[in-house]
């Protein structure tokens, strides 16, 4: 749809959104892309970095209370970013599993883009991950996890700012991984986090 092409063009003009497939290839394997989260433009940057043939079968995960709280936002994210929504509060979810829309999407053979930190982070190193991706991995152990490190977006459009600084963003796609047999939640979440950190360019210093 034209709105998707417009958002991608805007992302490329403003931040670059250059893809670097450093540990994986842009193939048709079903995947869950997990990335560090530093700004509102992160989702568009990853979306723009994916080839169009993968976008058709990939869905961005969006918070219902923020991205679907008015008709325009919902139209924009549904038609522009192929969004699937999760209801984070018990009141919105009406007692249902908030991950059910993601289970349904994966069960249909589609892929997801998700930010496991759950909130934006000012630092270059991701915060500890929320448990949602562990539950996805347990239910769909055959689905690849692809760590993605968004480089420079914390400086291009930091939390609290509304206009980007003119720097180039790179989306670095790292090595695929799966939930290992017998691996517990904490170990998996930390391994996933380290996968995102490892996808960074070598010159980026560790914390």
Which sequence ranges carry the predicted segments?
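A structural micro-motif
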Residues: 17, 56-58, 110, 143
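A cross-family acyltransferase "interaction/gating" segment
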Residues: 75, 111, 122-186
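Catalytic core of membrane glycerolipid acyltransferases/transacylases, capturing the structured
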Residues: 27-90
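Glycine-rich, highly charged phosphate/nucleotide-binding loops
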Residues: 14-19, 90-99
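Short hydrophobic helices that act as membrane-entry/anchoring signals
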Residues: 1-16, 74-78, 82
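Short beta-alpha junction loops
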Residues: 63-67, 118, 149-154
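N-terminal/domain-start segments enriched in small and hydrophobic, helix-friendly residues
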Residues: 25, 42, 48, 68-69, ...
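Helix-to-loop junction immediately C-terminal to a conserved catalytic motif
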Residues: 5-37
